[in-house]
Amino acid sequence: MKVLQWCRANAMPVIAVLAAAVTAVFVPPDSAYLGYYDVKTLSCLFCILAVVCALRGAGLFPLLAQRLVRAFHTARSAVTALVVVTLIGSMLLTNDTALLTFLPLSWFVLKGTGQTKHTALTFILQNCAANLGGMLTPFSNPQNLYLFNHYTIPNGEFLTIMLPPFLLSTALILACCLLIPRETLTVPAQETPVDKRRCIVYGVLFCTAAAMVLRGIPYWLGLAAITAALLVLDRRALLGVDWGLLVTFAAFFTFSGNMARIEPVRTLFRQLLAHGAMPVAALTSQVISNVPAAILLSQFTDDYPALLVGVNIGGAGTLVASLASLITFREYTKHVKGQTGRFLALFSAVSFGFLAVLLAAMTFWMQ
């Protein structure tokens, strides 16, 4: 029973490891396996997760969000502020970290002001903000980080590729915030304590992690410096890293590497990608989620602009299209009981609506 509970709580890494194991039956382990793993991507992801965990422990992100929300006095403006801070947070952190940080804050604000009836839509819009708003920077989500390193995309070109879908996504998200009524509310005055000295030190470490991603310093140097600093300053941050995400990533490297060596699979994806990498990437993401879709499809195409856009807008749609969406679902069901069906219906309506608009618009834009 305990094993089943553990597997249920860690479903994604378990599924990823099982998928890798199945492909290993068709491609037995050999020396080529060593070439599957992008050590730089794994190192950068680890450093970002560790530093962000340290910053969250120091109380910085909840404090910034609370002060932003306190400047607004209606349900619509408060929810918009929460959604915007999630969007901005996803660009600086990772999408899952932004949700882990700001979804609890939203519940605190909505419950404290008697506006829990807006929890479902607020959480869904924050989910869209995290998954779609974070597409603008290379280090905001795992698929961007991987593709940025895999194709060695120049910084300026990355921004040029992702700016149009980012602007459209932001406009759609802000438009949906208008669905929240302008009811007057009083935001709770309680403020999260913050350790200013630690925030400054961790801010320097975050800049170091960003420099690693942007190729400003060698990744091994940043990895050594950040790990050593946190071992001294905050070992809990290292323990708090989402190790399941790192295991998932490593397993999907194995999965995609093996799939790329199975000839019928190679033939199938080459035929599919001949019809356009972007729609194939977006639709593949609906089934296996956008991180493994990015890793898998990168083995079969050099059209990285279309693949990059496809896996990012493919984060909208099904609940599994982005792993971060499972965080939103888990957080909602933890706080709100008996409304799961309503939440899933609203989630599907909003998320598939976003996917349809973005896919149509970007297909036209990238012709």
Cite the ranges covered by each PLM segment.
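C-terminal transmembrane helix pair
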Residues: 159-170, 279-367
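Interfacial loop-to-helix junctions that mark the boundaries of transmembrane helices
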Residues: 3-9, 31-41, 153-165, 191-196, ...
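Transmembrane helical segments that form the transport core of multi-pass membrane transport proteins
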Residues: 36, 58, 62-67, 205-302
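Structural signal for alpha-helical transmembrane segments and their membrane-water exit/capping regions
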Residues: 2-32, 44-59, 179-182, 208-236, ...
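Hydrophobic transmembrane alpha-helices that form the pore/transport pathway of multi-pass ion
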Residues: 82-84, 88-132, 295-309, 337-341, ...
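Membrane-interfacial loop-to-helix junctions in multi-pass transporters
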Residues: 39-41, 70-83, 112-123, 197-200, ...
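Flexible interhelical linker loops that connect adjacent transmembrane helices
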Residues: 2, 66, 179-203, 235-239
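Membrane-core helix-loop-helix motifs of multi-pass transport proteins
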Residues: 114-182, 188-191, 328-358
